[in-house]
Amino acid sequence: MRDKWRKKRVRRLKRKRRKVRARSK
């Protein structure tokens, strides 16, 4: 159960990170 939650959070973090990278550029 915890693994599933962490995977979901990681996916969301990855998406947010991509947006932040484009903004930083």
From Swiss-Prot:
GO terms for MF: structural constituent of ribosome
Region (Disordered): 1-25
Recorded GO CC terms: cytoplasm; ribonucleoprotein complex; ribosome
Note: Initially thought to be part of the large ribosomal subunit. Crystal structures show eS32/eL41 to be a small ribosomal subunit forming a bridge at the interface of the 2 subunits.
Quaternary context: Component of the small ribosomal subunit. Mature ribosomes consist of a small (40S) and a large (60S) subunit. The 40S subunit contains about 32 different proteins and 1 molecule of RNA (18S). The 60S subunit contains 45 different proteins and 3 molecules of RNA (25S, 5.8S and 5S).
Entry's family note: Belongs to the eukaryotic ribosomal protein eS32 family.
Protein name per UniProt: Small ribosomal subunit protein eS32
Species whose genome carries this gene: Candida albicans (strain SC5314 / ATCC MYA-2876)
